[in-house]
Amino acid sequence: MYYVAGFNSRSDSFRFKQILDGNGIFCSIIETPFEINSACSLSIKFLASDLNAVRFIESRIKSSSFVGFFKVEENKFGRKITRIY
């Protein structure tokens, strides 16, 4: 299980990753899962243990292109994506 932060802007995705990196949060840029309706093809993947810190950082930034946070659960049958915020 991991979490994804979705944005409607590639530049905002890169900016958010830089901010998370600067705060010591391990994250990576991934292709946005098709289940997430976003105008941008890139999202930020991060660990479940960092969810509260990432939510706090996003609440301070308040990016206008922020789509939401999503929980991604994968198993041998596929994946389930749930919007959490």
Language-model regions, residue ranges each:
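Short amphipathic alpha-helix segments
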Residues: 10-26
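Short glycine-/aliphatic-rich beta-strand segments at the starts of folded cytosolic domains
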Residues: 3-6
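Short, glycine/acidic-enriched capping/hinge loops at junctions between secondary-structure elements
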Residues: 17, 40, 55-57
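A generic structural signal for short, non-catalytic loop/turn and secondary-structure boundary residues
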Residues: 22, 37, 62-65
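C-terminal structural segments of small proteins and small subunits
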Residues: 52-85
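Generic, ordered loop/turn and secondary-structure boundary motif
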Residues: 8, 15, 31, 35-37, ...
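Amphipathic, hydrophobic secondary-structure cores in small proteins
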Residues: 1, 26-46
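Helix N-cap motif at beta-to-alpha junctions
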Residues: 9-12, 47-52
